[in-house]
Amino acid sequence: GNHYTVEDKLWKGGKVELTICSLTDTQGIILKATAENLPSDARLCWAFGACDDKVVKTEQNDAIPTDACHDNVFCTEGNAFTVYYGEVMRLRTVHGVMPDGPEPILCDAHQQNNPLALYRSGKKTDTPVIAALRTWQEGEPLYFCLYKQNAKADYNRFMLPALFDKEIKNNP
């Protein structure tokens, strides 16, 4: 898998470790995130969007390119979601499973000045994304999975730790 360390002066010496693996049974990824020495009031805001078959080039400095969000339709159920995108007769889907915590909400991709602004932006938009805000305890691993569903790949959050362990062995 690919491993990344993220540090920020706001975290006062804390850091976030990310390990990302591709999935062997379908197109997709699983990500494990852990935190060390974050302030006790640290919260994680995650967001997802911009499903599009086209490569979108943008001059904006947005983490999620707004041009790729226009035709995204989200269906959430707890901490799982499905994104429908593409042309009406050729709809495609991406499935996602996120950690426990508050259910994801619709947000406005135009409002990416900072994570909290995106989270609080509201659902009236022509560029929908989903986001959630949750507390994060030191040593608590968080798992995220994005994938194309098929007969071998239909995941829920309880499966993610074992799925990550399997994929890290396949993608050292």
List the predicted regions and their residue ranges:
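A eukaryote-biased signal for short, well-structured alpha-helical docking elements
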Residues: G1-H3
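Acidic/polar, glycine-enriched structural segments that form the non-catalytic walls/loops
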Residues: W11, K15, L23-I30, T34-P172
